[in-house]
Amino acid sequence: MRTQGIKPRIREILSKELPEELVKLLPKRWVRIGDVLLLPLRPELEPYKHRIAEVYAEVLGVKTVLRKGHIHGETRKPDYELLYGSDTVTVHVENGIKYKLDVAKIMFSPANVKERVRMAKVAKPDELVVDMFAGIGHLSLPIAVYGKAKVIAIEKDPYTFKFLVENIHLNKVEDRMSAYNMDNRDFPGENIADRILMGYVVRTHEFIPKALSIAKDGAIIHYHNTVPEKLMPREPFETFKRITKEYGYDVEKLNELKIKRYAPGVWHVVLDLRVFKS
């Protein structure tokens, strides 16, 4: 979320059209993904929402404005209201990587940028990396582009998968990154991965057994989950450790990072874990 004072031009235009008390409620924060703007609006601004969106679009130079909503469902679909424009497909460039997506239907969090940048540095060219929840290539494209590693990207949702394939071509990594449109639990590979990405935060623990079956002995798993602050730092490591033990594995925690606040009192975290067969 970008925070700053309202652009003087926005205030200048809308102060002539909105009551003074509503001008004070104009959003000072927004998210820009490519040339699409995600704009939070207070309920009091509802009667003017389309005009407000139009002015923000003109001043900030975007083609489409969506009202921020909630993320829901197994595949983390956003629920946004279209306020201005019509085309919600865009190309967002970050750290030299092109991410094409439909912002209205596919989640992309600029707040996770540090983790995407970090992924560009973790893998070696001789590694095989399996991304179990690839999305549009959020985490695995940096590995393929900068780490030069071989990547298998698995994405269940057909619409999101279409953009994943496009992004592989856009970033010219077809020679080392392949994509599979399936539930990762149906992926046939076993004991193949040097590194596994589990960039998912809805019941991620349910996918640990599949990750273990894909992993080589000594593989590194980047395990994402959400955890109440009061349970940190014991969780989510203890749950991961318990499940790996049930399947005959030991685990070593190499690193733990906070990604962002997910909800009041809840953090999105990532653990870097090395797993060994007992």
From Swiss-Prot:
Belongs to the class I-like SAM-binding methyltransferase superfamily. TRM5/TYW2 family. S-adenosyl-L-methionine-dependent transferase that acts as a component of the wyosine derivatives biosynthesis pathway. Catalyzes the transfer of the alpha-amino-alpha-carboxypropyl (acp) group from S-adenosyl-L-methionine to 4-demethylwyosine (imG-14), forming 7-aminocarboxypropyl-demethylwyosine (wybutosine-86) at position 37 of tRNA(Phe). It catalyses: 4-demethylwyosine(37) in tRNA(Phe) + S-adenosyl-L-methionine = 4-demethyl-7-[(3S)-3-amino-3-carboxypropyl]wyosine(37) in tRNA(Phe) + S-methyl-5'-thioadenosine + H(+). Changing N112A: Loss of activity. GO terms for molecular function: transferase activity, transferring alkyl or aryl (other than methyl) groups; tRNA 4-demethylwyosine alpha-amino-alpha-carboxypropyltransferase activity; tRNA methyltransferase activity. This is tRNA(Phe) (4-demethylwyosine(37)-C(7)) aminocarboxypropyltransferase. Coiled coil: none annotated. CDD domains: AdoMet_MTases. GO terms for biological process: tRNA methylation; tRNA modification. InterPro entries: MeTrfase_TRM5/TYW2, SAM-dependent_MTases_sf, TRM5-TYW2-like_MTfase, TRM5/TYW2-like_N, TYW2_archaea. The gene is taw2.
